[in-house]
């Protein structure tokens, strides 16, 4: 469904807490932007309306020629990261325009996308929350094993998607319907209520919520 989307790239700085009406609220601090518009796509030319946002300083010598030419066409200095957001109001943007945290007033609902912390190879108890086998009474050195993964003759195979040990974390993940607690326009900071994916310093994308609750921000 077509809708207007506001977005900004930033870095996760960490978590802290603030007071709101005598209640302690846990928040994540995001160093958001400023981003710059590197391209505007239109329905007539590209078949869809979208805006490209670029973020993060980078040495121009490290940018490959095709990407460098893309930025030069927009008369914008090369950036380290780029993202494209589909939005019906893309025509209101122009190449070189700066996007800041002022796009996100306090109280608005947002979706935050990032890459989760990589945990490496993990067993089924840590990866999937299995309770493990009994601590005693017949269990011998198999306390953290997953147990049976299938029958011998029926079905005679392991079903696809069976939860097992394996690499955990390090995947793209979106947390929906978080509330912007406060905005610091001078320092380009967003205080988002709750936790967001990734370690400190991780790249995150903050955009207006796709499933915002009716009647205002999510509680």
UniProtKB/Swiss-Prot annotation:
Species in which this protein is naturally found: Salinispora tropica (strain ATCC BAA-916 / DSM 44818 / JCM 13857 / NBRC 105044 / CNB-440)
Classification via Pfam families: Ribosomal_L3
Gene3D superfamilies: 3.30.160.810, Translation factors
One GO cellular component term noted in the UniProt record for this chain: cytosolic large ribosomal subunit
Role: One of the primary rRNA binding proteins, it binds directly near the 3'-end of the 23S rRNA, where it nucleates assembly of the 50S subunit.
Gene Ontology BP annotations: translation
HAMAP family, A to Z: Ribosomal_uL3_B
Protein's recorded name: Large ribosomal subunit protein uL3
InterPro entries xref list: Ribosomal_uL3, Ribosomal_uL3_bac/org-type, Ribosomal_uL3_CS, Transl_B-barrel_sf
Keyword Translocase tagged: no
Any GO molecular function: rRNA binding
The entry's keywords: Ribonucleoprotein, Ribosomal protein, RNA-binding, rRNA-binding
Subunit structure: Part of the 50S ribosomal subunit. Forms a cluster with proteins L14 and L19.
């Amino acid at each position: 469904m077509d809708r207007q989307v506001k977005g900004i790239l930033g870095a996760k700085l960490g978590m802290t807490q603030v007071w709101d009406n005598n209640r302690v609220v846990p928040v994540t601090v995001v160093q958001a932007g400023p981003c710059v518009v590197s391209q505007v796509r239109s329905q007539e030319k590209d078949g869809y309306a979208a805006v490209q946002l670029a973020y993060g300083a980078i040495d121009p010598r490290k940018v490959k020629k095709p990407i460098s030419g893309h930025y030069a066409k927009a008369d914008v200095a090369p950036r380290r990261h780029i993202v494209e957001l589909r939005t019906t109001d893309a025509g209101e943007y122009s190449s070189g325009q700066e996007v800041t945290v002022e796009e996100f007033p306090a109280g608005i609902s947002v979706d935050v996308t990032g890459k989760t912390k990589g945990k490496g190879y993990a067993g089924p108890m840590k990866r999937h929350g299995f309770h493990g086998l009994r601590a005693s009474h017949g269990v011998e050195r198999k306390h953290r094993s997953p147990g049976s993964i299938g029958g011998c003759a029926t079905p005679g195979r392991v079903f696809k998607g069976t939860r097992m040990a394996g690499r955990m974390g390090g995947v793209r993940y979106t947390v929906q319907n978080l509330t912007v607690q406060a905005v610091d326009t001078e320092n380009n900071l967003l205080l988002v209520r709750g936790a967001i994916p990734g370690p400190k310093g991780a790249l995150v994308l903050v955009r207006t919520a796709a499933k915002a609750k009716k009647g205002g921000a999510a509680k």
